[in-house]
Regions:
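Conserved active-site and SAM-binding loop architecture
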Residues: 1-178
Length: 178
């Protein structure tokens, strides 16, 4: 989701493991904007029966708090922190924006929250029927693909995700378009 800023000439820095750890990152001066997308693993609403595990919201909040520390330290003109709709609302309150990717042209559902100080983008689509589609799996008795139920094999069908080939289904489902 930083790609439009990079294409517009901004100095974009991707702060993610293994190159950088947001918990220890020291930002440069004069940061104009921040886009943060902490891992959703600890905050997801999905009940993954195939891989039962206890959520560690404390560990998840370490990353969120590190993002917020950087945002507060930099005091940028705009900032946005993105995560799929889930338990993060317990800690950050209601988001400024909740949307479905198909509102903006990505042909799937994945309820997403964004907190921050930013201009809410105008929706490109009001009706699902108007969204250009891809050949993606649709669960029985549903009318739209749900990103949470797609497998990594769907990666090859999604042009906007070609920047990185995921090794696992979980890695695929955690991807944020550039």
């Amino acid at each position: 989701w930083s790609k439009p800023y990079q294409e517009a000439g901004y100095d974009v820095r991707i702060i993610t493991l293994p190159e950088y750890d947001v918990r220890t990152y020291i930002p440069p001066e004069n940061v104009y904007g921040i886009l943060a997308a902490p891992p959703c693993t600890e905050f997801s609403l999905l009940n993954c029966k195939a891989e039962p595990r206890k959520r560690d919201e404390v560990a998840g909040m370490e990353i969120v708090n590190a993002c917020m520390r950087i945002i507060n330290q930099c005091n940028p003109h705009f900032w946005a922190l993105e995560n799929p709709r889930g338990h993060l609302r317990k800690y950050l309150g209601m988001p400024k924006l909740n949307f479905q990717p198909w509102f903006y042209g990505d042909p799937w559902t994945k309820a997403t929250d964004i907190w921050g100080n930013f201009n809410i983008p105008k929706r490109k689509f009001e009706n699902w029927a108007d969204v250009p589609t891809l050949d993606l799996y649709i669960r029985p008795n549903r009318d739209k693909p749900n990103f949470a139920y797609l497998h990594k094999s769907a990666w090859s069908k999604i042009p906007q995700l070609q920047f990185h080939k995921p090794e696992t289904d979980a890695e695929f489902r955690a991807m944020t378009p550039p």
